[in-house]
Amino acid sequence: MTIKFLSENTINRIAAGEVIERPASVVKELVENAVDAGSTKIDIILERAGKNLIIISDDGIGMTDKELEIAVERHTTSKLDESDFLNIHTFGFRGEALPSIAAISKMLITSKKQGYDKAFQIKLIGGNEKQVTISVHNEGTKIEIRDLFFATPARLKFLRSDKTELVATVDVVKKIALAHPKISFSLTHDDRNLLKFKGHNKDVETNLKQRIIDVIGDDFIKNAAYIDFKTPDFSICGYTSIPTYNRASSEDQFLFINNRPVKDKLLQVALRVAYQDYLARDRYPLCAIFLQIDPQLVDVNVHPAKAEVRFHDPNYVRNLLIEAIKNALTNTSHVTSTTIASDALQLFKNHLVNKQPSVSKAVSVNSKPTDYRPAMSPSFKSTPNTDCQKLIDTLPHAKIEQEVERRIEREQQAHKQYKLGAAKAQLHTTYIISQTEDSIVITDQHAAHERLGYEKIKDYLKTEELIRQRLLIPEIVELPNERNADSLYENREKLYKLGLTLEKFGEKSIIVTEIPNILGDVNVQKLIHDLADHLSDFGENIALTELIEHVTETYACHYSIRAGRKLSADEMNALLRQMENTPFSGQCNHGRPTYIELKLKDIERLFGR
């Protein structure tokens, strides 16, 4: 077969295969173009999740007839300066989107440039039959895409159900809307309005906060820490959830580089490391985090869809993001999710409704069964018992009254002075009930004390080494490859401080001679393999943090107050005071709350007061 040049239309269809995977890809490319055009309002209309029709309308700068003709040709763009290719500030720059979409659909573009009298229209079918005509339109651009993938039926067969494709498009619009709070967005599907975000024109922080409420919800903002972190060439802002407000998946994690939504493994690892001490491995925080970096320090031209980026110094970026998130979380370290109390109150309400007695079964307070007989009670004379009176007379009344008054005063001060209030009771020898000025607090004594122990051993490890236990028979661990063995050996000094002593044994094996004493009868093979995997996948930060977490969790669990142990009032109050002075005491080591606060006004509502 001889080598030959491909036709322009074939080239565009190949490019479309890289850039346009589904209707959501079309919406992404065209909405980003509208953003680059300086739009303040962008409307999206879909039919059958975009398979039949996609319309994107904006009030941006618009195009002339000549610009319309050029715009649908490959590698034409108004956004890229050839002399400064690395300094990219716009979303689009490759000049591939419009011709690629046109090659696999029926496209109609109508546009009127700002300051011009006439509007123009260009029509393309499968990338051909380009016709520019005069039209009528407001300033801005409207692009209609019909019968997507009609020219590539094989790609059409790979599309998912309308519901699945629509979910993907909604996700795309939400991400772009988050990055541009000043722009109004609307999304309509089959004549049903799905999204409507009004543009916000206040200060940057207020705009961002309001748009996050629009997209993710008010509950997230109420349970999130604000991030504001800056270096000379780097800034991070946004919101990230407190540990007790988490999800079972990472769907609600929105990460942006220079306002570009990205799915970047390095950033996801940094997020995981930042929450390492506070969340179980199968739980995920919610976040909307925006990283602003000098465009010359990040390469966005890694993938045609521009979903991936490459950093000039990835470790620097990762460490900054970890530090920024941890700093933000420190400011909310004693807070638990606001939804926990409301969920608990809802359970109470449901229980009250389900257990409400019917009218026919209701019993009058004053009614008595027919066979009721009052129990015989001891007879008391109106004059006091002489022996009792003598005993009472001998008691130091003044001292008793003073002590009672002092105790009442101390408790009243505790209600006002301490966030977790004064302990009042212990429920089922597991939960501490305390009272503040306007609420009651229920504390899980085991989870709370476990967290206190966890933080204590973490502080200890900053300056001290763990006690090591020498294995009677050194364990030889064979690893999958030489790289895993080398990475473990390179970190042997750090591992030694954590109580793990190892030596190289051949190309792919490690000999373990000592383990942290606190771990006891641990599976050494699994421990080393897990460490090697984490070093390989995520780097030393998260791998060593995994080991620290394993050690500290074991220590904290072994030495914490168990559920079922009876505590005195002084012990309960001492635990509450320690919690108030310990970072991140609001959640256990797995992200579950250590206490729940029920406001008095909410309790009163339960009783209809």
From Swiss-Prot:
Pfam family, one: MutL_C
SUPFAM superfamilies named in the record: ATPase domain of HSP90 chaperone/DNA topoisomerase II/histidine kinase, DNA mismatch repair protein MutL, Ribosomal protein S5 domain 2-like
Entry annotated with the keyword Cell cycle: no
Membership in a protein family: Belongs to the DNA mismatch repair MutL/HexB family.
SMART domains noted in UniProt: DNA_mis_repair (SM01340), MutL_C (SM00853)
PANTHER family named among the record's database cross-references: DNA MISMATCH REPAIR PROTEIN MLH, PMS, MUTL, DNA MISMATCH REPAIR PROTEIN MLH1
Region entry Disordered, spans: 364-386
Protein name from the UniProt record: DNA mismatch repair protein MutL
GO molecular function list: ATP binding; ATP hydrolysis activity; ATP-dependent DNA damage sensor activity; mismatched DNA binding
One example of a Gene Ontology biological process annotation: mismatch repair
Keywords, comma-separated and alphabetical: DNA damage, DNA repair
The keyword Phosphoprotein is assigned to this record: no
Gene Ontology cellular component list: mismatch repair complex
Protein function: This protein is involved in the repair of mismatches in DNA. It is required for dam-dependent methyl-directed DNA mismatch repair. May act as a 'molecular matchmaker', a protein that promotes the formation of a stable complex between two or more DNA-binding proteins in an ATP-dependent manner without itself being part of a final effector complex.
The organism of origin for this protein: Rickettsia akari (strain Hartford)
InterPro entries with a match to the protein in the record: DNA_mismatch_repair_CS, DNA_mismatch_repair_MutL, DNA_mismatch_S5_2-like, HATPase_C_sf, MutL/Mlh/PMS, MutL/Mlh/Pms-like, MutL_C, MutL_C_dimsub
HAMAP family the UniProt entry points to: DNA_mis_repair
